[in-house]
From Swiss-Prot:
Name of the protein this chain belongs to: Golgin subfamily A member 8T
Any GO BP: Golgi organization
Coiled-coil zones: 86-148, 224-411
InterPro entries, per the entry: GM130_C, GOLGA_cons_dom, Golgin_A
Source species, domain of life: Eukaryota
GO annotation, cellular component aspect: cis-Golgi network; Golgi cis cisterna; Golgi cisterna membrane
Keyword Cell cycle: no
Keyword annotations of the record: Coiled coil
Gene field: GOLGA8T
Amino acid sequence: MAEETQHNKLAAAKKKLKEYWQKNSPRVPAGANRNRKTNGSIPEKATSGGCQPPRDSATGFHREGPTSSATLKDLESPCQERAVVLDSRSVEISQLKNTIKSLKQQKKQVEHQLEEEKKANNKKQKAKRVLEVQIQTLNIQKEELNTDLYHMKRSLRYFEEKSKDLAVRLQHSLQRKGELESVLSNVMATQKKKANQLSSRSKARTEWKLEQSMREETLLKVQLTQLKESFQQVQLERDEYSEHLKGERARWQQRMRKMSQEICTLKKEKQQDMRRVEELERSLSKLKNQMAEPLPPEPPAVPSEVELQHLRKELERVAGELQAQVKKNQRISLLNQRQEERIQEQEERLRKQEERIQEQHKSLQQLAKPQSVFEEPNNENKNALQLEQQVKELQEKLGEEHLEAASQQNQQLTAQLSLMALPGEGHGGEHLDSEGEEAPQPMPSVPEDLESREAMSSFMDHLKEKADLSELVKKELCFIHHWRDRRHQKTHHLLSEPGGCAKDAALGGGHHQAGAQGGDEGEAAGAAADGIAAYSNYNNGHRKFLAAAHNPADEPGPGAPAPQELGAADKHGDLREVSLTSSAQGEAREDPLLDKPTAQPIVQDHQEHPGLGSNCCVPFLCWAWLPRRRR
């Protein structure tokens, strides 16, 4: 485009130059000088630059040419005209040079403009390319915007539909809200009415409960003071009883020392009796030898028949005494052997029972937790009854053994004392006559195991160990009684409470159900009651044991068997078994707690299941658990 415009401009400039040269071409006619003279305007025409049109000169030349009457003046001055023309042409040339210069300048300007236009065109082309690229990117962006617009329109339609649904739901929810508010207002009104009605009742109930709690608190305080006083009295009684026990122990030790001294004397007497028996045997052998010897030719004085009969009787008596003494010694040795076997068996049973007790003590620690107490109270009551029965059985067996040993020792001592009280056996005829008339009496003897002082001391230590074991068993029995009584009392208290329920009583969590009414005072009262009950049961059991120990051999205690039964048991070589069910029934008949409503189903359940008495897996309740439970 720029090149075409440049060519067009150059062509236009060339045309202008041709026209200018044509206009300024030199054509002067012959009658020009005359015209200049007449007109008087020759210098003006020359100065005007010869701009006369060629048509006029041509017309003047042709107008004067055919005429032959041209003046000489006009023809005489052609040189002057040409000089004028030359001057005019020089002027025109200078003007043309100026115009050429101006044209060259214009050309330079035009070329400069062309270069600038080229640069501008290049810039425009570059800008055009950039614009085309931008147009393409804009087209792509336009397409993307169209797609986005389409998606936006679709989403707008979706949201419009959703907003319509939400508006409908909002209307429904507002309607539902209005309905619920109306219902709520009605319910609140009814509740206010009911609250107003119940407030009066609740006030009366709370006042009644408050009064009852105050009464119970006063009763508990009174009971606490009474229990403290009784606890102090029991402590004093315990001190007195401990002093009494110390005195009894010293008395028993003195008696045992006396018995040991008497046994030593009896041993000496036995040795003397053995010597007498040997002397009698020697005399008997001498008599036999004398009787067996032949009579001399001169017989001496023959003894009378009375003397011979007396000697025979004495011989028979001595032989009977020897046989009775041998039999008695054998019987006593057998009794001692059986007693030792039974003691060993009993020790083995006690050892096994201690192992079971240790195992059950571990299980009891788990059962002592509140969860186990709440879960299986009936099983615990049954186990407590079972353990109590087993402890009673062991106590009866130990009591039987102690009573049997004591009765045997008492019989031996009484027999020895009675024989010691009799007059000594002489060698005279009167003494032989009196002995012959009386029935033959057996000679007392001491067990072979008691021949030495060491055996006697070991036997006494064994008896002390058994006594200590029986005391421990009685303590455990007393604790079981106390624990069962405490459990029944707490369950009965829970059942008798106005706000209590049968479920809590059935669960058996007595000390866990203590509320704010008891507090620390209730715990202290419970601890004092526990100590009093345990100590009273312990005193009763120990008094019974002392009474059984002080009973003579011919008058056995109420819990001990007769000597004939003991002898029969010794012949069979085993201990008499005790029925746990019968003891449990007897205990149930004697137990004052059966009048309570909570104790009856427990005893009934125990009677319905007699196999529980033979079960060895029994939880052992030790004294160490009691203070921990009180915490």
